[in-house]
Amino acid sequence: MKKMSILSAAIFGLMMSAPVAFADDITVSVVGPMTGQLATIGDQFKQGAQAAADAINAAGGVNGSMIKLDIEDDQCDPKQAVSVANRIIANGVKFIDGHACSGSSIPASAVYAEAGALMMSPASSNPVLTDAAAKSGWPTIMRLYTRDDAQGAFIGPWIAKKYAGKNVVILHDKSAYGQGVADAVRATMNTGGLKEVYYDAINPGEKDYSALVTKLKDLKADVVYFGGYHPEAGLILRQSAEQNLKFQLIMPDSIASPEFWQVAGPAG
């Protein structure tokens, strides 16, 4: 219901303030990783958007117009995201529910801003998205998700306090999202008085992280904070268990997918 009211209000506001012509339906492009290893996130996007559209339409639509969804796949790839954004604008769509990954949202936002389209990202947390929009004077670029620096302000000090004296490792997957949130947590954890014993990036999509697991064993890691997504997190945890290594894994809510448990197995 919250998403329904935000979407409805945003569309209504842009309708009243901008010279946008509408037919019987209002098209909203829902953009995310509909295929690929992060497709579960895209599926969540689709289901959430459909529930919101159904509720809005059942209540009479927006100013009498019905919501129609256009599902687009960017696979969380920045280049594909820009291509998708250009296609959406070429098709005359003015309302975008997406993108998911910060690395996709940031470059795509420039395309939407130039066209005066409303972009609301439900999942992109890198501060650059809205900071760049504010600096450039793009009022139609928005996020519905907590920024990395806000997440770091909470998680970093908590780790510093709870795991004082422990061996903490911070990893990320090189993405705008993963590195952004990992760096935010690292900075506030350090300010809180705890220094990590190891900080590094992994290569996402790999099937064998045994070298990393060996490194974690050598470091006697007690805690691993991972800025990234569930496929790699589950695999690292499973392969660690196979080498009899146990540690406390801490992640943002990108871990919240049934696939994490499928990949991690009993180690999860």
Residue ranges and their predicted role:
Residues 63-73, 92, 193-201, 219-223, ...:
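A local structural motif
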Residues 82, 89, 160-161, 217, ...:
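Non-catalytic positions within long, well-ordered alpha-helices that form the structural scaffold/packing
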Residues 93-198, 248-267:
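Extracytoplasmic ligand/sensor domains, especially the bilobed periplasmic-binding protein
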Residues 18-23:
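Sec/Tat signal peptide C-region and signal peptidase I cleavage site
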Residues 102-113, 207, 214, 221-243:
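Hydrophobic alpha-helical
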Residues 25-42, 99, 167-171:
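Short beta-strand segments enriched in small/hydrophobic residues
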Residues 25, 40-47, 55, 59-132, ...:
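Beta-alpha junction/loop-to-helix N-cap segments that form part of ligand/metal-binding clefts
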Residues 1-8:
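Bacterial N-terminal signal peptides that target proteins for export
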